[in-house]
Amino acid sequence: MEESFLGDELTRLRSNSRMSSWRSSQSIREVFGGSSDVFMKNYSTRWREMAEEEEKELKWAAIDRLPTYNRLRKGMMKEVMSNGRVVHHEVDMTKLGNQDKKVLMESILKVVEDDNEQFLRRLRNRTDRVGIEIPKIEVRFQNLSVGGDAYVGTRALPTLLNSTLNTIEAVLGLIHLSPSKKRVVKILEDVSGIIRPSRMTLLLGPPGSGKTTFLKALAGKSEKDLRVNGKITYCGHEFHEFVPQRTSAYISQHDLHHGEMTVRETLDFAGRCLGVGTRYDLLVELSRREKEAGIMPDPQIDAFMKATAIDGQETSLITDYVLKILGLDICADIMVGDDMRRGISGGQKKRVTTGEMLVGPAKAFFMDEISKGLDSSTTYQIVKFMRQMVHINDITMVISLLQPAPETFDLFDDVIVLSEGQIVYQGPRENVLEFFEYMGFRCPERKAIADFLLEVTSKKDQEQYWFRKSRPYVYISVPEFSESFNSFQIGEQIIEELTIPYDKYSVHRAALVKNKYGISSWELFKSCFTREWLLMKRSSFLYIFKTTQITIMATIALTVFLRTQMKAGTVKDSAKFWGALFFSLINVMFNGMQELAMTVFRLPVFFKQRNSLFYPAWAFALPIWVLKIPISLVESAIWIILTYYTIGFAPAASRFFKQLLAFIGVHQMALSLFRFIAAAGRTQVVANTLGTFTLLMVFILGGFIVSKDDIQDWMIWGYYLSPMMYGQNAIAINEFLDDRWSAPTNGSQPTVGKTLLHARGLFTTESWYWISIGALFGFSLLFNVLFIAALTFLNPIGDTKAVKVENGDKNNRRPQETAIVGDIQMAPTRSQANTSSVIPFPNNESRKGMILPFQPLSLAFNHVNYYVDMPAEMKTQGVEEERLQLLRDASGAFRPGILTALVGVSGAGKTTLMDVLAGRKTGGYIEGSINISGYPKNQTTFARVSGYCEQNDIHSPYVTVYESLLYSAWLRLASDVKTETRKMFVEEVMELVELKLLRNALVGLPGVDGLSTEQRKRLTTAVELVANPSIIFMDEPTSGLDARAAAIVMRTVRKTVDTGRTVVCTIHQPSIDIFEAFDELLLMKIGGQVIYAGPLGHRSHKLVEYFETIPGVPKIRESDNPATWMLDVSSSSMEAQLVVDFAEVYANSNLYQRNQLLIKELSTPATCSKDLYFPTQYSQSFITQCKACFWKQHWSYWRNSQYNAIRFFMTVIIGILFGVIFWNKGNQIHRQQDLLNLLGATYAAVMFLGATNASAVQSVVAIERTVFYRERAAGMYSELPYAFAQVAIETIYVAIQTFVYSLLLFSMIGYQWTAVKFFYFYYFIFMCFTYFSMYGMMVVALTPGYQIAAIVMSFFLSFWNLFSGFLIPRPLIPVWWRWYYWASPVAWTIYGIFASQVGDRTDELELTGETEKIQVNEFLKEYLGYDHDFLLVVVFAHVGWVLLFFFVFAYGIKFLNYQKR
């Protein structure tokens, strides 16, 4: 009907239009004759516009007649035809295609910098026109204090001893037997204020001042282990009255995303989960009022509002809008990437984190350091867009920035200055300088106000800003500032406002969100299901690998247990069938264990999204469960199809399908179990340890390793709780109750099959098969429920951070202490600081840390090009080129004593150029010349004379600051530098970089624990400086720092340059002070092209003069930061506006010609000069490298309590459990089953704890490997000393672990107490655990990532398990596989232990189903193939295994580099 009506209307319109056109043309011809073509054209244009307008009105009238539900889903989009005619189409907004979205966004935001404000005003005007009020939120906080408890001093370091003492103290504290040794640490102290809507607030404060804690508290996301006191209200309502996590959005400074998803997919998922909020209700009311008023809305605005008001869409127009304003549209379809997967840049990743919350409907935003990694121009644009949103849409917003440029600072309405947990100022930006002048401090000319605000509370920096020369300067502390602000006019006004309660009844009903989630439960499930399916597709390699692995294992199993070798029907024939059944079972279980690593890997993103109420835990867990069911079906089917009939199991078809069902049940149970363990453990080390321990208990009590009848009576409950027992019963009953095992026997059981089941303690009726199947699926359900419960109630394990304690404060705390508190980072009081705020140095300051001699070197590069293989995702978009060019004809020169800045917008290629010049690229294709003081660069020698400060600040987490520096100096300074000189040099560098107060602080992991970002930056700089290099590359040394910390780093850099070194820095957001501290600039644009290379000049006048000579470039204003102005005027949009290519302008300039002459001069060796030469590749000898690496590994292991404390704890627990389960079995060898139980005990004792070691060590080695890549690139050591140190320290801890384990097992199992037997027992277990650890290390070295390493490890462990001699004794292994028995290290260990402990015994042994007896040693030789006389060979074989794995590990890290740069 609607289409018919619309068609009739259009026909009438066209008919009327034709008649009107004819009449008009006739009258025109009559009046003007045929002579006025101009008038005719104008009239024709006017007529066409009228017709188009009329057509638009008619189409809107048709839409307006639709029912409300349909009307809100229909919009109009215009299309400009090739002849210039505009046609309006009716579009279903729920089915917008990519092209439709692109057209709509282009029509709304053609040039985002110019059009965004106008677009937002058009949106707002539409609501204002019909009198709809937009909800607003005012946030108040009164007497807000946040604190926590922390250990201080040496107790703060997480050593094994401290961890043990802390655990004991915590347990005793629960029962009030021991007072806590923790100290109270205050993070925020009695702060009050108001965050107003429609005003954008800047939060300033040095790292450690409590900014993150403050923002989290306002957003209702304070850490659970912190004490929060005071009152926070939204429009007068406290947190319990609404859902603060959905009313507001906290944007973290840490970028946690799924690397497998593209930028667009990441934002689409966030938008889908967060929902549309009140956008749909607003649209309903808006549409109703417009219809009543007869108002026709702007079609573009109407289409946008409708497209963004429909929830549950897989992809939304709001995503396209956010991508556009954040500048992410250029990388929208590129993977986000992670540590081992190439993706977008760090700055782009930071914007993705911001965009993830902007796509949601929140009305208040608390943004934590959103500019980290962004250049000042990009930051300015993003903050400008935020300002437009705040002012036009009445949003409440607080943004924390570290180094805001003056023009970015001017965008804010209000400023909060936070220092040492107290508010120093809160109020209008315009009045902030007035307050500090009221206090006696004035901001100097050309000093950024933000920088001044950060420094004026510092004791060291404060005096330089004192302007009341008539009065003597006295230091004003932070509490004094805070108190004075309360008596300042603005402070008094805030206090007065806080005394007047907010009128809760005037609050807009849509302002505060009462629903916990943004969409319905079904939509949440669909969203998470879609994402899980996407992640599975992107990780398809893992599943293909797993499927291939199980196929290979099934093939091996069928050749080991080949049908032709498998006779059935008698008790003697059953051994191989038991082995085949148990191997199948254990293989399926181990295959499920790979789920553990994959789940732990996903948890950080899950916790972030769960806490932001994207979805509940069940919505995350159920899709994983559902989508893994087909995986279980496929993997189980592959195993059964390949093995069932080829091995020769019961031939009935029904039994084939019953075994398949059993294996599906076991596989589902295993996947669910390990998912639950991953969620409970939450970290790789803890989860791995718990996983292996659980496997151990499930297997031991499962009825195969030890039969039910031999389990202690008081532990029989464990037998019935073991899921493995039900799997074992199901497959055994299915096989042995078949007709071919029904031959009668003379024993207590009527048939052979039942005799075999009874001997193993299994059930003997068919009904128990179905009971077992029900139990397996019941366990699967239970573990999935527990998985959901763990995800719902558990939080990430609270890692610790170092806290510096004040010196000389009112509590008389001792200096140079560190304290540990969960997720707290406190700064030192400014009384403790020993820094200057400006880059120029006092005249009396000595330049320390550079006393060792060095050779000044220059670096010249000419016509450098760099290519990488074209990314697959770009090829899918139609790009045909095979290579992507990242650097294009880059040329320049860096000279001694000259500090060069390498600047460009995000993605310009700054880091790429630096990596190419420093020789840090691991892939790609490099063209062009690079010369060092006239000679072609040789990377081996260049590494000795250069330093590279990486952007990511990678360091070993478990050593202190002083140890990191001493280690670097030890390995990188010349071997003739004496130890005392080296230590003095380190001390001087620490003073230079101002790390003295942090000498004993633990480094920690970036973004997790340990040092703050700015402290880590200074450490990175110091680590390179102690190497005494001639050329230093610094990748964004000031990124992530506040202005004061950046000044400290740059002052250090300046001192370094003034000693005659060559220093190059990439830099993102330089203040005027920092930018003008550089001597020269190399400016790049997107595409990797140089657009300026030359001197800056006094106050950057040479740079300014160069760009101002280019026609059309706007002049710089007096107050502008030259760095920001430079990036603005050279941006891509400015190029498009001026129709100019700045790279081409530079290439045709005189400056370029002069630079080419300089490059030519520096590329020619000086007279009488020599090329760099070192007699050895490394500074230190092989022995010294080993000593240094071992020294660092020693401290790393001693402080890695999570790894070692858990390892020793599990060793004791497993040892005791084994001892209890196998109590005195060594003295009770009378029956064949007794000996098999003992063999099972030996097998389990070495296999499971050994596998635990192999699995747990992988995460330790993986973390250290990233540090190894940096240190190797720096030429610190060769691979063998590193491998030696890693292996040596692990071996020492294994030796201690083995002693504890051996003592427990040997004494409790009841082996014969002789020195020789105990030595053998200890030796074999020690060597076993050692080669297991070496194996874990080796697999990490050979694989690119932790997940792949876990899969590869379990694959070969299955081999070792099959050929260990337990599942199938060596004499029964087919001759074509018997060689692999000797290739299984576990087989040698079991051989060694069993032969040494019982191989010489001559006791009589009863055989199952036989009347004759046999001596133990004879049985071992005949049935198991163990000979006591072969022990010496076994002893030396273990040495061979250890050495083999060690050398493969060493050569793996030597020749394989999985770091992608």
Swiss-Prot record:
Similarity comment: Belongs to the ABC transporter superfamily. ABCG family. PDR (TC 3.A.1.205) subfamily.
Full protein name: Pleiotropic drug resistance protein 2
ABC transmembrane type-2 domain: residues covered: 523-736, 1184-1398
Binding residues for ATP 2: G904, V905, S906, G907, A908, G909, K910, T911
A Pfam family of this chain: PDR_assoc
SMART domains in alphabetical order: AAA (SM00382)
Single GO MF descriptor: ATP binding
Function: May be a general defense protein.
Keywords from the named record: ATP-binding, Membrane, Nucleotide-binding, Repeat, Transmembrane, Transmembrane helix, Transport
Binding-site residues, ATP 1: G205, P206, P207, G208, S209, G210, K211, T212
Residues in ABC transporter domain copies: 172-445, 859-1111
Lineage: Eukaryota, Viridiplantae, Streptophyta, Embryophyta, Tracheophyta
Primary localization class, coarse: membrane
Record flagged with keyword Repeat: yes
Family annotation (Gene3D superfamilies): P-loop containing nucleotide triphosphate hydrolases
Topology with respect to the bilayer: Multi-pass membrane protein
Cell compartments where the protein resides: Membrane
Record organism: Nicotiana plumbaginifolia
Top-level taxon: Eukaryota
Cited InterPro entries: AAA+_ATPase, ABC2_TM, ABC_trans_N, ABC_transporter-like_ATP-bd, ABCG_dom, ABCG_PDR_1, ABCG_PDR_2, P-loop_NTPase
One Gene Ontology cellular component annotation held by this UniProt entry: membrane
Transmembrane segments: 541-561, 577-597, 622-642, 660-680, 685-705, 771-791, 1203-1223, 1243-1263, 1291-1311, 1321-1341, 1348-1368, 1379-1399, 1430-1450
